[in-house]
Design a protein with these regions (language model features):
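Short Cys/His-rich local motifs and their 1-3 flanking residues in nucleic-acid-associated proteins
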Residues: 143
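Extracytoplasmic c-type cytochrome modules immediately beyond a signal peptide or single-pass transmembrane anchor
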Residues: 27-137, 146-183
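Short, cysteine/histidine-rich loop/knuckle motifs that typically chelate Zn2+
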Residues: 140
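C-terminal motif of bacterial Sec signal peptides marking the signal peptidase cleavage site
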Residues: 21-23
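Bacterial N-terminal signal peptides that target proteins for export
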Residues: 2-14
Length: 183
């Protein structure tokens, strides 16, 4: 079955999360933001694992670079936006701002935190930062480079010439999913 045919089913978690967030008056409450972040993470993880099963870690690189932004865009509706930021940048589009860096430092200092709140600005009413921690499968592309397949190293170097997102260990803070409520 093609991804195109499964797309409506794959987006159901987003619809449920958005409905939950929309039911909150004024600003997104913490549980709703966590639900939206979890839906995004589940959808991305499902595509990554399918890509890994179909063609190994080299195949997964394309999912992170091309599909992850699209999945985030699909989740960003009705005044809410979802994006990823990294503690070490691979994709320059995921470079954390100064406010993002402060939230990442707070998440690093609180390893058991489910999320941290960030301040808004002229465009964003509120931010929730949900930690992304390194899992075993993540180590294929984000672990030590001396253990990576040469084809994977080449794929990463081609797609991300300034890659800094390696050298992580299991459980490390990789970054965060940022859920923003817009004015």
């Amino acid at each position: 079955m093609s991804l195109r045919r499964r797309a409506p089913v794959r987006l159901l978690p987003f619809a449920a999360a958005i409905a939950t967030v929309a039911a909150c008056s004024g600003r997104a409450d913490d549980d709703a933001a966590l639900a939206l972040a979890a839906s995004f993470q589940q959808a991305l993880k499902a595509e990554l694992m399918a890509a890994m099963a179909a063609g190994g870690p080299v195949n997964a690189v394309k999912v992170c670079s091309e599909r992850a932004p699209a999945i985030a865009a699909e989740a960003s509706k009705d005044g809410y936006s979802v994006r990823r930021i990294g503690t070490r940048v691979r994709n320059l589009a995921n470079t954390p701002s100064t406010a993002d860096q402060q939230a990442l430092a707070e998440l690093a200092a609180k390893p058991d935190a489910r999320f941290v709140r960030g301040n808004g600005d002229d465009v964003v009413l509120a931010r929730r930062y949900v930690p992304l921690r390194i899992e075993a499968a993540c180590l294929n592309c984000h672990g030590k480079t001396d253990g990576m397949q040469s084809e994977l190293q080449q794929a990463l170097a081609t797609r991300y010439p300034d890659d800094k997102a390696t050298g992580y260990a299991l459980g490390d803070l990789r970054g965060a999913i940022v859920v923003e409520t817009r004015h």
